[in-house]
Curated annotation (Swiss-Prot):
Keyword Nucleotidyltransferase in annotation: yes
Function: DNA-dependent RNA polymerase catalyzes the transcription of DNA into RNA using the four ribonucleoside triphosphates as substrates.
Sequence intervals crossing the membrane: none
Catalytic activity entry: RNA(n) + a ribonucleoside 5'-triphosphate = RNA(n+1) + diphosphate
Gene Ontology molecular function terms on file: DNA binding; DNA-directed RNA polymerase activity; ribonucleoside binding
Keywords annotated in UniProt: DNA-directed RNA polymerase, Nucleotidyltransferase, Transcription, Transferase
Family: Belongs to the RNA polymerase beta chain family.
Origin organism lineage: Bacteria, Bacillati, Chloroflexota, Chloroflexia, Chloroflexales
Organism: Chloroflexus aurantiacus (strain ATCC 29366 / DSM 635 / J-10-fl)
Record-given protein name: DNA-directed RNA polymerase subunit beta
């Protein structure tokens, strides 16, 4: 026998808090971190995108909309004017808890102050209008809509602006460029160049026209700098838009004699001046309408220059200015329009044509549409604003119509405004939009990821069928903004992404990521004075102490303080020489002290070059800003003064990875994990996993079901606490204070200002995915808490940390083929000790409605039901709490009237004498579905008579919650965090499991063959480190890209008294013999996923049939059959199993008469008759006949066989035997 290894016992890693420990701090799991790089900044609140965006909408978004629509005038513009003034949100009628329980929407009343001006008399009528109940976001970034929690997912779309694209001409291979001008709202302009050098334009996707027609026409529009403008008078129109004027506009760019773009286009242009161009443009855009100057001018104005019809939005103007006015193409000193100008200016269009000619001539570069500088995020607030705008525009139409119908003197704001279009628009958005999603609540991580998701689908976005490879691919601009790993597998791959850990959305909607500023030089006094006012805090480069605050006005003294403060302690990169006297003040390499700094400040030098130092200042850069800078990675080695140790470092510049001298570096990453999303940053040793498996790992963590006793991972990454805290499933203290009382249902904290705050806990609530949400206090009485501390754990958290699975002892070895093809063998201990047991809660509802024949009734008095079936029902006919139910048990007794039957004369006489109505009812009770069993944990009854808000025609609703405890069993799916997934093939008795030399059996056996080809080595390192850490009694944090090294793990294994290679000899539990080779053993974190066998297993003997094909329905929900497909038929043919095959094609499928006779024969124990003709064969005959072929069926003696066409007569001949167990016609 080898030397025995001591038993590995997981002790509680944190001592429990003594209930009397007054003033003790909140409990947190302590982790030993392997990180070498400290994050430069703390993680932001992970759901701040949602919260900030909705706050913006409430504060500014609504204001913008009301300003946009005001004033609404009548069609003449002379009688009435309606102005929307200020607005307020009232208090919600019910809180979130009540809304969830009663299936209501958590909403606040929106009221608007409206002013109606009667222009003829000058009278003003004011009133406050109720604009409907507006859904309000909860503190967790969700909406409670009709009782269910929903999330509005941010949308990633192409930003408004102008985009230039290179298209190869197929015959010559010449580069011909196109330009697209995309507004936020309004007509698109698409410019193209053909091989004959003609530049054409499509206005609003109509016909192509030579661009000079548009150019001539807009020369007559005189635009002001603020975007307003006017047309020149009719009598002067002939003076504008002549050929020489157009040629003059582009003389400086159209310089290649072989390709005279403007001349070639003018040759194709039938018009000669602005007047003709306007009429020609109108003819092309509105063929069939009589062209008049008035019509032409108003059409062009409304298409391009009217703020009501055309809106670039602030972001569109920003992109337009960046692309047209900041490109270093020509320096004519022209100033870019202001960002407040949200319509087109004629000079924008001239500039686009200029740019197009330059690109065709080989100057400049086209745009990359997949670059994140060209894609922006529409967050919740903007999406709701857009939908609210739709509602307001519908409301405007109604108001205008009513204005024209009503007498102006008697009109009132209430009489003109109908809020229904606004309410309907919001209902449409929250209930039906592709971006308003039923929240994934499987576990806290699923909830958090759902809120941080970015979708390229949805209205105005891409469609998954037409999206190509490029748009789905990882792009260099995703770095630090969109996770390159986490995206769904399947048709949505690359179209749905997740924000990286540190990413945020700026006010333009572009994704930004933070970087630490690197100082290569320090500005001297005169430069600081020129800046005037500080736009940011200035901090000491060594200590991070504040030198001068943002907003400070810079004078001589402050400029001196700033420069001296920045220079102190830095090392000069070059000699400092007095320019006046040529005196050497200090040599390169000198460390600057205060005295030297004060001398340097007096010199007339603008910039003092220092050895590069990484400051504490953090700048958030968008993707197009980042492309201008050289950025070094977070793992570049620094000394204690934050100076680089190497002279050449690995950097990123644009899309290239380059090695640069440190003097050229502008910024440094703030953290190694800023590249990936929260879900991916929870995978330890991510750097050792193949990307495909890491993708599966981050997706599968979201599917982990909450277990009975959550257990935080031994090997974590340090992100577990923040992920759980920001998810919204745990309760976080709002302010500092001391816990006054704690029960399983509420926690009361006395805050430092003397106020008491009560926190309600969610107990055994059903989540959207039928998992159980149950909050448990994580604090004790007398304990001191700080704002932001977790005070109550949820279903998948342990002491405030995310705990999605369990730490189990795994062995990597084949075992009797039981773990072939990724299957997993588990020990019975996991079943017996409820290690992987989860709780699931299902909701069943029944409504008692008014029918044409009378009201339905919830009652215990159900026809043809024995006492045994009623044993668990109370006197109302509703099951009592605590009852254990099986499939087909009655949950709620309900009867529905069937209508009067025809009575005989005698019965009519009896009814007339005794006054009783012949009333027949049918049993329509709510029963437990097939395959479901569990315990009733809650019953809620909502009655109209008691004031409940119910849908029209519903008198009463009863809701029953059924709870199931599911232990791990064969067929359940399990996975690790590295994409190592498999199905449990067998639950082995503990005594049969392989055991360690100390007699301890392993919990799970995984197949080692699943590792090399998948290249997810992270699981092996996790197993080794987990074993050592469990043995030494602590938990570890090994952050992504900055985790434990192999030698560190080996050292820990040795320290724990374990073999350095992490392998040990195992013994067969059945025979006690040792296995031939040592086996890798250790602690791995395994998850039980939501794909549970109990939800999937299904069997059918008879059941419903499709009315069209008469074949069994498919799927578990329909109680359907299993498809016996083409390949299965081949198998039976190969074996010559003729009778089995015939049964499959006839009585088990669509031979209507045959299947009933077969059923009858089986029940009566008689021999089964020969099969009949299947329905599909009859269809085939009819199809051939419909093609004009005379096809008929002949018997063995060649006589025609009559096939019945009438299904009803077939069924009528069956004397009421019904196989389906359903009323005919239900399917």
């Amino acid at each position: 026998m080898p030397p025995l290894i001591e038993s590995v016992v997981l002790q509680p890693l944190i001592a429990p808090i003594d209930p009397g420990a007054d003033g003790r701090r909140s409990r947190r799991i302590e982790r030993r971190s392997f990180a070498r790089i400290k994050d430069a900044i703390d993680l932001p609140l992970l759901i701040e995108t949602q919260l900030k965006s909705f706050e913006w909408f409430k504060r500014e978004g609504l204001r913008e909309l009301f300003d946009e629509i005001s004033p609404i005038t009548d069609f003449t513009g002379k009688n009435l004017e309606l102005h929307f003034r200020d607005y307020t949100f009232g208090e919600p009628r019910y809180d979130e808890f009540e809304c969830r329980e009663r299936d209501l929407t958590y909403a606040a009343p929106l009221r608007v102050r409206v002013e109606l001006r009667i222009l003829t008399t000058g009278e003003i009528k004011e009133s406050e209008i109720f604009l409907g109940d507006f859904p309000i976001m909860t503190d967790n970034g969700t909406f409670v809509y009709n009782g269910a929690e929903r999330v509005v997912v941010s949308q990633l779309i192409r930003s408004p602006g102008v985009y230039f694209k290179d298209e190869k001409e197929p015959t010559s291979g010449r580069s011909l460029h196109t330009a697209k001008l995309i507004p936020n709202r309004g007509a698109w302009l698409e410019f193209e160049t053909n091989k004959r050098d003609v530049i054409s334009v499509k206005v609003d996707r109509k016909r192509k026209i030579p661009v000079t027609i548009l150019l001539r026409a807009i020369t007559a529009w005189i635009a002001e700098e603020n975007g307003n403008g006017r047309w020149v008078p009719d009598n002067e129109l002939d003076k504008f838009g002549h050929n020489d004027q157009i040629i003059e506009l582009f003389r400086h760019v159209d310089t290649v004699p072989e390709h005279p773009y403007i001349h070639a286009t003018l040759d194709k242009d039938p018009s000669r001046n602005a007047k003709e161009a306007l009429l020609e443009l109108y003819k092309r855009l509105r063929p069939g309408d009589p062209p008049t100057l008035e019509n032409a001018r108003s059409l062009i104005e409304s298409l391009l220059f009217s703020p009501r019809r055309y809106d670039l939005a602030k972001v569109g103007r920003y992109k337009l200015n960046k692309n047209l006015w900041e490109r270093d193409v020509r320096r004519d000193g022209a100033k870019a329009p202001d960002l407040s100008v949200r319509v087109l200016l004629p000079r924008d269009i001239f500039r686009i044509v200029e740019q197009l000619i330059l690109l065709n001539n080989g100057h400049g570069r086209p745009d990359d549409i997949d670059h994140l500088g060209n894609r922006r995020v529409r967050t919740v607030g903007e999406l709701i604003q857009q939908q609210f705008r739709v509602g307001l525009l519908r409301l405007e139409r109604v108001v205008k119509e009513r204005m024209s119908l009503q007498d102006p003197a008697s009109a009132t704001p209430n009489g003109l405004i109908n809020i229904r279009p606004v309410v309907a628009a919001m209902r449409e958005f929250f209930g039906g939009s592709q971006l308003s999603q039923f929240m994934d609540q499987t576990n806290p991580l699923a909830e958090l990821t759902n809120k941080r998701r970015l979708s390229a689908l949805g209205p105005g976005g891409l469609s998954r069928d037409r999206a190509g490879f490029e748009v789905r691919d990882v792009h260099h601009s995703h770095y630090g903004r969109i996770c390159p790993v986490e995206t769904p597998e399947g048709p949505n791959i690359g179209l749905i992404g997740t924000m990286s850990t540190f990413a945020r959305v700026n006010e333009m909607g572009f994704l930004e990521t933070p970087y630490r500023k690197v100082y290569n030089s320090v500005d001297n006094v005169q430069v600081w004075k020129e800046k005037g006012i500080l736009l940011r805090d200035v901090r000491d480069l060594r200590t991070g102490d504040l030198i001068a605050a943002k907003g400070t006005r810079v004078n001589d003294e402050i400029a001196r303080q700033i420069t001296i403060g920045l220079l102190r302690g830095q090392i000069l990169r070059e000699d400092i020489v007095d320019p006046d006297t040529d005196e050497l003040i200090a040599e390169a390499g000198t460390e600057i002290n205060r005295a030297l700094a004060e001398r340097i400040v007096e010199l007339p030098i603008k910039h003092i070059k220092i050895r590069p130092v990484v400051s504490q200042e953090v700048d958030y850069l968008s993707a197009d800003e980042e492309d201008r800078f050289v950025i070094v990675q977070a793992n570049a080695p620094l000394d204690q003064h934050n100076r680089f140790l190497d002279t050449i470092v690995s950097c990123r510049f644009g899309e290239d990875f380059v090695s640069e001298r440190v003097e050229r570096v502008d910024y440094m990453d703030v953290s190694p994990k800023q590249v990936v999303s929260v879900s991916t940053s929870l995978i330890p040793f991510l750097e050792h996993d193949d990307a495909n498996r890491a993708l599966m790992g981050s997706n599968m963590q979201r599917q982990a079901v909450p277990l009975l006793r959550p257990d935080a991972p031994i090997v974590g990454t340090g992100m577990e606490y923040r992920a759980a805290r920001d998810s919204g499933q745990v309760i976080v203290a709002r302010r500092d204070g001391v816990v006054v009382s704690t029960t399983s249902e509420r926690i009361v904290i006395e805050e430092d200002d003397g106020n008491q705050t009560e926190y309600r806990l969610r107990k055994f609530m059903r989540s959207n995915q039928d998992t159980c949400i149950n909050q448990r206090p994580a604090v004790v009485r007398g304990q001191r808490v700080k704002a932001g501390d977790v005070i109550a754990d949820s279903s998948s958290t342990d002491q405030g940390e995310l705990a999605l699975g369990q730490n189990v002892l795994v062995a990597y070895m084949p075992w009797e083929g039981g773990n072939f093809e990724d299957a997993i063998l588990v020990s019975e201990r996991l079943v017996r000790e409820d290690i992987f047991t989860s709780i699931h809660i299902e909701k069943y509802e029944v409504e008692a409605r008014d029918t044409k024949l009378g009201p339905e009734e919830i009652t215990r008095d159900i026809p043809n039901v024995g006492q045994e079936s009623l044993r668990n029902l109370d006197e109302r006919g509703i099951i009592y709490i605590g009852a254990e139910v099986q499939p087909n048990d009655i949950l709620v007794g309900k009867i529905t009237p069937k209508g009067e039957t025809d009575l005989t004369a005698e019965e009519r006489l009896l009814r007339a004498i005794f006054g009783e109505k012949a009333r027949e009812v049918k049993d329509s009770s709510l029963r437990v579905p097939n395959g479901v069993r569990g315990k009733v944990i809650d019953v809620k009854v909502f009655s109209r008579s008691e004031g409940a808000e119910l849908p029209v025609g519903v008198n009463q609703t009863v809701r029953v919650l059924l709870c199931q405890k599911r232990k791990i069993s064969a067929g359940d799916k399990m996975a690790g965090r590295h994409g190592n997934k498999g199905v449990v093939s067998r639950v082995l008795p503990i005594e049969d499991m392989p055991f360690l030399p100390d007699g301890r059996p392993v919990d799970i056996i995984l197949n080692p063959i699943g590792v090399p080809s998948r290249m997810n080595i992270g699981q092996i390192l996790e197993t080794h480190l987990g074993w050592a850490a469990a043995r030494l009694g602590f938990r570890v944090a090994t952050p992504v890209f900055d985790g434990a090294h192999e030698d560190q793990i080996k050292d820990l294994l040795v320290q724990a008294g374990l073999p350095a290679d992490g392998k040990v000899t195992l013994y067969d539990g059945r025979t006690g013999e040792r296995f031939d080779n040592p086996v890798t053993v250790g602690y791995a974190y395994m998850l039980k996923l939501a794909h549970l066998v109990e939800d999937k297993i299904h069997a059918r003997s008879t059941g419903p049939y499709s009315l069209v094909t008469q074949q069994p329905l498919g799927g578990k929900a329909q109680f359907g059959g299993q498809r016996f497909g083409e390949m299965e038929v081949w198998a039976l043919e190969a074996y010559g199993a003729a009778y089995t095959l015939q049964e499959m094609l006839t009585v088990k499928s669509d031979d209507v008469v045959g299947r009933v006779k077969t059923y009858e024969a089986i029940v009566k124990g008689e021999p089964i008759q020969e099969a009949g003709v299947p329905e599909s064969f009859k269809v085939l005959i009819k199809e051939l006949q419909s093609l004009g072929l005379s096809v008929e069926v002949l018997s063995a003696d060649e006589k025609p066989v009559e096939l019945s066409d009438d299904l009803d007569s077939d069924i009528g001949a069956l004397e009421g035997i019904n196989l389906s167990g359903m009323e005919r016609g239900e399917f």
